[in-house]
Design a protein with these regions (language model features):
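Long, low-hydrophobicity ectodomains and other hydrophilic envelope-associated domains
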Residues: 1-2
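Amphipathic alpha-helical packing elements
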Residues: 6-7, 11-69
Length: 108
């Protein structure tokens, strides 16, 4: 089971997965130039939601499709220092609607 942890230091917000820095997944989409944030709704929390979901799901498109709801329901509610397990992430995904295509996908 993976363990995701976030906290703040003099260097800013730091997020790890199993003790290693979490990849922000700018290759999928760049929401924030400033990196990760949490405790509110916005671009930094959106980047964290995408990174957590991409790591957990192993599916970039599904992660992108679920980012907004996961950011609002989970990331915006995290404390300054937090810990989530892969089981916590999975439990948070259960009540979310099935992942639609990201905006702009499938439109012709």
């Amino acid at each position: 089971m993976k363990v995701y942890e976030g906290g703040r230091s003099l260097d800013g917000a730091v997020v790890t997965v199993d003790g290693e820095l979490l990849d922000p997944r700018f290759d999928i989409r760049r929401f924030s130039r400033m990196g990760f944030e949490w405790t509110y709704e916005g671009d930094g929390p959106r980047q964290l939601a995408l990174a957590l979901l991409a790591d957990h799901l192993g599916d970039a498109q599904r992660a992108l499709a679920l980012t907004e709801d996961f950011m609002r329901d989970v990331v915006a509610e995290l404390d300054n220092a937090w810990r989530l397990t892969s089981a916590d992430v999975e439990a948070a995904l259960r009540p979310l609607p099935p992942s639609p295509l990201p905006r702009g996908e499938g439109e012709h």
